[in-house]
From Swiss-Prot:
Modification N6-succinyllysine, positions: 179, 250, 335, 485, 498, 538, 547, 615
Domain of life from the UniProt record: Eukaryota
Regulation: Enol-oxaloacetate inhibits the succinate dehydrogenase activity.
Implicated disorder: Mitochondrial complex II deficiency, nuclear type 1: A disorder of the mitochondrial respiratory chain with heterogeneous clinical manifestations. Clinical features include psychomotor regression in infants, poor growth with lack of speech development, severe spastic quadriplegia, dystonia, progressive leukoencephalopathy, muscle weakness, exercise intolerance, cardiomyopathy. Some patients manifest Leigh syndrome or Kearns-Sayre syndrome. MC2DN1 inheritance is autosomal recessive.
Modified residues (Phosphotyrosine): 215
Sites bearing Tele-8alpha-FAD histidine, chain numbering: 99
UniProt cofactor(s): FAD
Protein species of origin: Homo sapiens (Human)
Protein name, UniProt field: Succinate dehydrogenase [ubiquinone] flavoprotein subunit, mitochondrial
Transit peptide start-stop: 1-42
GN (gene name): SDHA
GO annotation terms (biological process): mitochondrial electron transport, succinate to ubiquinone; nervous system development; proton motive force-driven mitochondrial ATP synthesis; respiratory electron transport chain; succinate metabolic process; tricarboxylic acid cycle
Positions with a binding annotation for FAD: 69, 72, 91-92, 98, 100, 105, 221, 275, 440, 456-457
Length: 664
């Protein structure tokens, strides 16, 4: 090992010498495409060896840095550049490989193209869908901004599906209603057939090319640069050559996506590893509501690939082994278009009670073949292809085998509706200076305990834009960037070096699989205290096993072994907070369904008139947000709670929706 390490140090010294010429030497080859940090701004980069003589560190300075280049990150980045800010965007993937591309169904907005609609009805549905854990000021902001956001996308060139008279086509989607739940099913979901995320991401990427944003493509963000409680940028690893980069900025936006890969079966990309959530945790800041994990009702059985809710919006139905449309029993009004948590639980109950399909009776069927073939070809072309590839099913002739699959994380980095990251001190929310978050990485909280389908793409564009607007309101391009310590980021580099030379007994892939299976078995659609407690013990033990990892690639150029190990560290922090938060929450709400605590525990019993009832103390009810912290050294999880925000931004224009019994 000493020989390997010595050779590595020699190579590192050579890289340091090369790095000193880095600001003036352009890379060659086609990989420079859309990599504008290689352009005229390179002169602003400076090499520092103050962290480590073995790891070259290149310092950069920008007005703002965005971490992540999915829908939320792109919208924030080009919004800042458009406003004149010198902006960097750090992404471990080429932008169009981000997980936004996998979203299928659509984006909600009360355009009223199919029938009369109102954004306040959308607001009501979102609050109800959140099981009254959503913050109503943020939901007000998102739903009111939705129509303008969709029109903006259309103006950018997004090729929405159209009605015969040329308007944007809107399909039915789960949990959507008219007239505050009293007017029947709403058609509010704007779509591009069943490839809406693909079109949205490519549209935003195309728009981003108009602006002079510096893209650090295939750079892995290691940690935030924090000084005196303020965020002053990010430190990142260049995956291509192994150099370390400190990107100092007055404003940092975290848009790194979710942490779906904490589970064994999920629709998330393999890169959805909770990087931003973990960076926040290592910075000593809280994460919020991580126990609320959405299981999408229709993942392909055995593969986990997403089958959009748009199938049911177009008229598809779920059936059990008896050919029964079973959702009529669980949600008599909405049926197959009930909220996702309701449908996933109903499917699980059907399987438990022996009405599952297939030889093992462990899934149900999604039937589409009763729909006209031309409708399937025009509205659901991607699903037809996916079902054939991953299930061997011709959707015009036979049903698709489906099973609830982890799909979305309602929890994340706590923010207000302006995208500003929050900490909770002495019972009060405080803004973390210089730090913003948006997209699935953030928890605004517009989704509460359960997200409505087609609100995620809306979340991306509305709050990506909101982050840019917030920074524009509080800063000016060229404002002085606060300094950082000469050794800022030293711990991140030490951790990287430790993992690079890790020589334990457990492979990264083995430990990751153990974590994923433990989460799948102990924190699934239905949860129970004894199983959650066992899961807490198992995940804590697995977290301790990180010290026994073994990596095999000691190099620094395209070391995917090292990157996957860094991602595993991030996933472990997310898994800890998810399962400990779930064990502590002694109720059922939204996607968090406890079999030992089957009811929602609010400050009042909303199944009865509240007149004459005594309000439960904050400590005795669960209509509150979980805030979780992790001691990174020991893996100990600490939980706190903060109130849900019930007030809207303007009560006269949009009244608060009081809690009620949630049914569909």
């Amino acid at each position: 090992m000493s020989g390997v390490r010595g050779l590595s140090r020699l190579l590192s010294a050579r890289r340091l010498a090369l790095a000193k010429a880095w600001p003036t030497v352009l890379q060659t080859g086609t990989r420079g495409f859309h990599f504008t940090v290689d352009g005229n701004k390179r002169a602003s980069a400076k090499v520092s060896d103050s962290i480590s003589a073995q790891y070259p560190v290149v310092d950069h300075e920008f007005d703002a840095v965005v971490v992540g280049a999915g829908g939320a990150g792109l919208r924030a980045a080009f919004g800042l550049s458009e406003a004149g800010f010198n902006t960097a965007c750090v992404t471990k993937l080429f932008p169009t490989r981000s997980h936004t591309v996998a979203a299928q169904g659509g984006i909600n907005a009360a355009l009223g193209n199919m029938e009369e609609d109102n954004w306040r009805w959308h607001f009501y549905d979102t609050v109800k869908g959140s099981d009254w854990l959503g913050d109503q000021d943020a939901i007000h902001y998102m739903t009111e901004q939705a129509p303008a956001a969709v029109v903006e996308l259309e103006n950018y060139g997004m090729p929405f599906s159209r009605t015969e008279d040329g308007k944007i086509y809107q399909r039915a989607f789960g949990g959507q209603s008219l007239k505050f739940g009293k007017g029947g099913q709403a058609h509010r979901c704007c779509c591009v057939a069943d490839r809406t995320g693909h079109s949205l991401l490519h549209t935003l990427y195309g728009r981003s090319l108009r602006y002079d944003t510096s893209y650090f493509v295939e750079y892995f963000a290691l940690d935030l640069l924090m000084e005196n409680g303020e965020c002053r940028g990010v430190i990142a690893l260049c995956i291509e050559d192994g150099s370390i980069h400190r990107i100092r900025a007055k404003n940092t936006v975290v848009a790194t996506g979710g942490y779906g890969r904490t589970y064994f079966s999920c629709t998330s990309a393999h890169t959805s590893t909770g990087d931003g959530t973990a960076m926040i945790t290592r910075a000593g800041l809280p994460c919020q509501d991580l126990e609320f994990v959405q299981f999408h009702p229709t993942g392909i059985y055995g593969a986990g690939c997403l089958i959009t809710e748009g199938c049911r919006g177009e008229g598809g139905i779920l059936i059990n082994s008896q050919g029964e449309r079973f959702m009529e029993r669980y949600a008599p009004v909405a049926k197959d278009l009930a909220s996702r948590d309701v449908v996933s639980r109903s499917m699980t109950l059907e399987i438990r009670e022996g009405r599952g399909c297939g030889p093992e009776k462990d899934h149900v069927y999604l039937q589409l073949h009763h729909l006209p073939p031309e409708q399937l070809a025009t509205r659901l072309p991607g699903i037809s292809e996916t079902a054939m590839i991953f299930a061997g099913v011709d959707v015009t002739k036979e049903p698709i085998p489906v099973l609830p699959t982890v799909h979305y994380n309602m929890g994340g980095i706590p923010t207000n509706y302006k995208g500003q990251v929050l900490r909770h001190v002495n019972g009060q929310d405080q803004i973390v200076p210089g730090l913003y978050a948006c997209g699935e990485a953030a928890c605004a909280s517009v989704h509460g305990a359960n997200r409505l389908g087609a609100n995620s793409l809306l979340d991306l564009v509305v709050f990506g834009r909101a982050c840019a607007l917030s920074i524009e309101e509080s800063c000016r391009p060229g404002d002085k960037v606060p300094p950082i310590k000469p050794n800022a980021g030293e711990e991140s580099v030490m951790n990287l070096d430790k993992l690079r030379f890790a020589d334990g007994s457990i492979r990264t892939s083995e430990l990751r699989l153990s974590m994923q299976k433990s989460m799948q078995n102990h924190a699934a659609v239905f949860r129970v205290g004894s199983v959650l407690q066992e899961g807490c013990g198992k995940i804590s033990k697995l977290y301790g096993d990180l010290k026994h990892l073994k990596t095999f690639d000691r190099g620094m150029v395209w070391n995917t072994d090292l990157v996957e190990t860094l991602e595993l560290q991030n996933l472990m922090l997310c898994a800890l907070q998810t399962i400990y938060g779930a064990e502590a929450r002694k109720e059922s709400r939204g996607a968090h369904a406890r079999e030992d605590y089957k009811v929602r525990i609010d400050e009042y019993d909303y199944s009865k008139p509240i007149q004459g009832q005594q309000k439960k103390p904050f400590e005795e009810h669960w209509r509150k947000h979980t805030l979780s912290y992790v001691d990174v050294g020991t893996g100990k999880v600490t939980l706190e709670y903060r109130p849900v925000i019930d007030k809207t931004l303007n009560e006269a224009d949009c009244a608060t929706v009081p809690p009620a019994i949630r049914s569909y």
